[in-house]
């Protein structure tokens, strides 16, 4: 779970003290007595790279949305002005999210239009407003208290280099300390006055601290690297965990069906199948007549497939395709740049952060044909205005007892009884106790 500090400046002071103590304390009290000058210079090079990458991770802006940024084909999207924004500077979508892009090459592909009232600008996909940095961050991963900065598209390479150099430096120091500990053990029968007591005390103090830093940073580095290889940020990993836990929730699928009806007006909800089957082709009849929009949207949200249940029976979370996973190699290059730039202090990512590339798998095999996340960003107003009218509150309060009794799998029953099954996106907490606010996301602006 993300650390919340009472005085944020401590998030930078504490790492600086630890880096200074480990690097220069170990060099002065221990290493200078045992390493050659060349080895000492190599060690100090590692320390210097730690400082450089740390400073860059702190001072590099994680990615600010361009002031003139506008979503593609925004002019063709139904947008209404708020009452006090008649000059057009504060455009908001008619709903909380609205269809913005349709890519003719791959069929109906779209993304949510989001407008940040605090930044007075549109939000690109994957961006979020940080409540601490007070800006919208491109491809926001999380707000890091130890850099007093967000980790986003532009400074993710610096952050990963910072972690990498710490692992390399503390790993090198750990090897030298282990050698000295073995040497002390082998000569433990010698008189005590022959040992350098200051050096011995330094080894006893520095070794556990160095191991703790090495192990904790290694775990964080591996976690971040796995996320990068998946093409996902920590926020998107959290989003996936939320969808996975709520996959059998009627509330989730009412939202998905409502969003589908809102974005693909006049088209019935598709028949969803597992990846082992072929999705049935559905003939879509375009309906240009707006009519009574609210009534039509409610009907599309609930009555597209009257013969089927709200929750698809042959469609699992494994059949859901994340739109920005381009494959391990492309994900690494987009996030960190080409390999020759990975160790360069000023290496930059290939992606610009506000025009994310869509994977071919998503274009070809996605069945829901909805933006990410499929149940939408803001859900409170939709639930109040639509879902409760269609019996969501009854489903939530009176769970189907016969269905629960028929479940024999303990893990499945435990998941179905999880109180997080029907909570809103803003209230969801994953197994590590993390919510959106723990990543620094401003929920009021998201």
Swiss-Prot record:
Its EC number is 2.3.1.225. The active site is at residue 144. PROSITE patterns: DHHC. Residues 1-8, 62-161, 223-446 are cytoplasmic. It is an enzyme of class 2 (transferase). One of its GO terms (biological process) is protein targeting to membrane. GO terms for cellular component: endoplasmic reticulum; endoplasmic reticulum membrane; Golgi apparatus. It catalyses: L-cysteinyl-[protein] + hexadecanoyl-CoA = S-hexadecanoyl-L-cysteinyl-[protein] + CoA. It comes from the Eukaryota. Pfam families: DHHC (PF01529). Residues 30-40, 183-201 are lumenal. Keywords: Acyltransferase, Endoplasmic reticulum, Lipoprotein, Membrane, Palmitate, Transferase, Transmembrane, Transmembrane helix. The chain crosses the membrane at residues 9-29, 41-61, 162-182, 202-222. It is a multi-pass membrane protein. It is found in: Endoplasmic reticulum membrane. The DHHC domain is required for palmitoyltransferase activity. Mediates the reversible addition of palmitate to target proteins, thereby regulating their membrane association and biological function. Belongs to the DHHC palmitoyltransferase family. PFA4 subfamily. This is Palmitoyltransferase PFA4. It comes from Candida albicans (strain SC5314 / ATCC MYA-2876) (Yeast). The gene is PFA4.
